[in-house]
């Protein structure tokens, strides 16, 4: 069976991930007119720029959908977002600022839940609006086939017939109007935006040029913290975790993770927390650029890692960062549910996140400027008295440290011999450039 269909399968049911925007509206109407039987599926991901979800399926029916369903994906999306925080599943960072993989998380949820809904309706052909140059076409492909092994893929944007007739937004708008729908193109922005409850992605158009900065972006989850005319008073906030799970903000306990994430977004968004400008490597190895918002994810991540560093030992923290970066890359590639990702997730959640219990107090200022004011946890292995510089009872004595330093002589001696060996091989010389003149007789030993 051919998995990818290059041309419209007339007479067959096709499920389309329907956003209600111009592209998917025109595609749905075009497919209906060409003889297909389109079914529309809309994911409610809590997008901050969507005002009326209930209206989207109604529009789909007007454009010719055989049926239209709204699938509430918010609970699952937040669950996966919290799992990503617990695992540190983020691999793209620039200057200490993190991209929280909010779009890949959204695709993991959408790609599985919508295809599962289609399968319930006997729909085994799926289309969406992803283009052949991006990451989403592969993410949706993987998640769709994981959910339904019998799935076939039809994307209007890979169909030359569709492209020849409706190859651009102007043509799509004219097509909708000609068919009796008063569909006006929205005002063109200088960039494209995709969002869900966890974060927003701004990319393409003017943002493809690196001399266009964050200053051209109008945040949808935060504020223009770079604009001095925007007043942003400092704010203290406390975040509480229990066994790796965020449960309270400013003393308010949440039993609903969706409401907790919305409140975290509101708090962080008031300051523009979590905005970052990243150059990243797409799945196909070409570089792209995006400006990201994720105020709630950033707030929870900061508090989580503060507790992490105070609770776990150095080697565990190192493994958390190493495995988290690996997991973040798998998530980015659309492999969040692959076996290697599940293995990494299980270890990080079981042995790292389970011990993260406590409360962190921060002061948020402008953008990513913040201070940590207090850290409280019964699980802290940070003990001030162990290394206090004040006089008093200590957990070890000067003689203990002398013994420990004496034991270091073994590896120091070995290291000196290695340096002499490198000099003999011509790899090192006793020059100021190498910083080795302090090692006595190095040049002589190397001869």
UniProtKB/Swiss-Prot annotation:
<comment type="pathway">
    <text>Amino-acid biosynthesis; L-arginine biosynthesis; L-arginine from L-ornithine and carbamoyl phosphate: step 2/3.</text>
</comment>
<feature type="binding site">
    <location>
        <position position="192"/>
    </location>
    <ligand>
        <name>L-citrulline</name>
    </ligand>
</feature>
<dbReference type="GO" id="GO:0005737">
    <property type="term" value="C:cytoplasm"/>
</dbReference>
<keyword id="KW-0028">Amino-acid biosynthesis</keyword>
<dbReference type="InterPro" id="IPR014729">
    <property type="entry name" value="Rossmann-like_a/b/a_fold"/>
</dbReference>
<feature type="binding site">
    <location>
        <position position="136"/>
    </location>
    <ligand>
        <name>ATP</name>
    </ligand>
</feature>
<dbReference type="InterPro" id="IPR024073">
    <property type="entry name" value="AS_multimer_C_tail"/>
</dbReference>
<dbReference type="GO" id="GO:0000053">
    <property type="term" value="P:argininosuccinate metabolic process"/>
</dbReference>
<feature type="binding site">
    <location>
        <position position="129"/>
    </location>
    <ligand>
        <name>ATP</name>
    </ligand>
</feature>
<feature type="binding site">
    <location>
        <position position="194"/>
    </location>
    <ligand>
        <name>ATP</name>
    </ligand>
</feature>
<feature type="binding site">
    <location>
        <position position="99"/>
    </location>
    <ligand>
        <name>L-citrulline</name>
    </ligand>
</feature>
<dbReference type="Pfam" id="PF00764">
    <property type="entry name" value="Arginosuc_synth"/>
</dbReference>
<feature type="binding site">
    <location>
        <position position="43"/>
    </location>
    <ligand>
        <name>ATP</name>
    </ligand>
</feature>
<feature type="binding site">
    <location>
        <position position="131"/>
    </location>
    <ligand>
        <name>ATP</name>
    </ligand>
</feature>
<feature type="binding site">
    <location>
        <position position="139"/>
    </location>
    <ligand>
        <name>L-citrulline</name>
    </ligand>
</feature>
<dbReference type="Pfam" id="PF20979">
    <property type="entry name" value="Arginosuc_syn_C"/>
</dbReference>
<dbReference type="GO" id="GO:0004055">
    <property type="term" value="F:argininosuccinate synthase activity"/>
</dbReference>
<dbReference type="InterPro" id="IPR001518">
    <property type="entry name" value="Arginosuc_synth"/>
</dbReference>
<keyword id="KW-0067">ATP-binding</keyword>
<keyword id="KW-0436">Ligase</keyword>
<dbReference type="InterPro" id="IPR023437">
    <property type="entry name" value="Arg_succ_synth_type2_subfam"/>
</dbReference>
<feature type="binding site">
    <location>
        <begin position="17"/>
        <end position="25"/>
    </location>
    <ligand>
        <name>ATP</name>
    </ligand>
</feature>
<dbReference type="InterPro" id="IPR018223">
    <property type="entry name" value="Arginosuc_synth_CS"/>
</dbReference>
<dbReference type="InterPro" id="IPR048268">
    <property type="entry name" value="Arginosuc_syn_C"/>
</dbReference>
<dbReference type="GO" id="GO:0000050">
    <property type="term" value="P:urea cycle"/>
</dbReference>
<comment type="similarity">
    <text>Belongs to the argininosuccinate synthase family. Type 2 subfamily.</text>
</comment>
<feature type="binding site">
    <location>
        <position position="135"/>
    </location>
    <ligand>
        <name>L-citrulline</name>
    </ligand>
</feature>
<feature type="binding site">
    <location>
        <position position="203"/>
    </location>
    <ligand>
        <name>L-citrulline</name>
    </ligand>
</feature>
<dbReference type="GO" id="GO:0005524">
    <property type="term" value="F:ATP binding"/>
</dbReference>
<feature type="binding site">
    <location>
        <position position="280"/>
    </location>
    <ligand>
        <name>L-citrulline</name>
    </ligand>
</feature>
<feature type="binding site">
    <location>
        <position position="201"/>
    </location>
    <ligand>
        <name>L-citrulline</name>
    </ligand>
</feature>
<dbReference type="GO" id="GO:0042803">
    <property type="term" value="F:protein homodimerization activity"/>
</dbReference>
<keyword id="KW-0547">Nucleotide-binding</keyword>
<dbReference type="InterPro" id="IPR023434">
    <property type="entry name" value="Arginosuc_synth_type_1_subfam"/>
</dbReference>
<feature type="binding site">
    <location>
        <position position="136"/>
    </location>
    <ligand>
        <name>L-aspartate</name>
    </ligand>
</feature>
<keyword id="KW-0055">Arginine biosynthesis</keyword>
<keyword id="KW-0963">Cytoplasm</keyword>
<dbReference type="InterPro" id="IPR024074">
    <property type="entry name" value="AS_cat/multimer_dom_body"/>
</dbReference>
<feature type="binding site">
    <location>
        <position position="131"/>
    </location>
    <ligand>
        <name>L-aspartate</name>
    </ligand>
</feature>
<dbReference type="GO" id="GO:0006526">
    <property type="term" value="P:L-arginine biosynthetic process"/>
</dbReference>
<feature type="binding site">
    <location>
        <position position="135"/>
    </location>
    <ligand>
        <name>L-aspartate</name>
    </ligand>
</feature>
<comment type="subunit">
    <text>Homotetramer.</text>
</comment>
